[in-house]
Amino acid sequence: MSISLTESAAQRIVAFLDNRGKGVGLRLGVRTSGCSGMAYVLEFADVVNEEDQVFEDKGVKVIVDGKSILYLDGTELDFVKEGLNEGFKFNNPNVSSECGCGESFHV
């Protein structure tokens, strides 16, 4: 099982955590939402729960709950800038389809 970060994503997460002044890493998960069934959840993590799995890449801890890892295994998190827009992008090999707006996906 693995979760990885691009250099751009790692730098952005470190900057967010430094600016926030606390936290053990980034919590990555999924929730039921949208027209395709599932959506990604990104939050700061202040604690690691017993059922969490912790992945470390480029000095950043990514914390994933036990249920979400089934949908996120092998995912690469990137941070991209396209014109005036910027944000995190998920390169998830488990996704079979995405909704037209890109906000949700199906595995």
Curated annotation (Swiss-Prot):
S-S pairs: none
Which SUPFAM superfamilies does the UniProt entry name for this protein? HesB-like domain (SSF89360)
GO MF annotation terms: 2 iron, 2 sulfur cluster binding; iron ion binding
What Gene Ontology cellular-component terms does the record carry?
cytosol
* Cofactor dependency: Fe cation
Q: What PROSITE patterns does the record point to?
A: HESB (PS01152)
Q: Name one GO biological process term.
A: iron-sulfur cluster assembly
Q: Which UniProt keywords apply?
A: Iron, Metal-binding
> What residues bind Fe cation, as annotated?
C35, C99, C101
Q: How does it assemble?
A: Homodimer; may form tetramers and higher multimers.
**Family the entry assigns:** Belongs to the HesB/IscA family.
Question: Which HAMAP family would you find in this protein's record?
Answer: Fe_S_insert_IscA (MF_01429)
What is the protein's known function? Is able to transfer iron-sulfur clusters to apo-ferredoxin. Multiple cycles of [2Fe2S] cluster formation and transfer are observed, suggesting that IscA acts catalytically. Recruits intracellular free iron so as to provide iron for the assembly of transient iron-sulfur cluster in IscU in the presence of IscS, L-cysteine and the thioredoxin reductase system TrxA/TrxB.
Q: Which PANTHER family match?
A: IRON-SULFUR CLUSTER ASSEMBLY 1 HOMOLOG, MITOCHONDRIAL (PTHR10072:SF41), IRON-SULFUR CLUSTER ASSEMBLY PROTEIN (PTHR10072)
* Protein name, as recorded: Iron-binding protein IscA
**What species was this sequence derived from?**
Xenorhabdus nematophila (strain ATCC 19061 / DSM 3370 / CCUG 14189 / LMG 1036 / NCIMB 9965 / AN6)
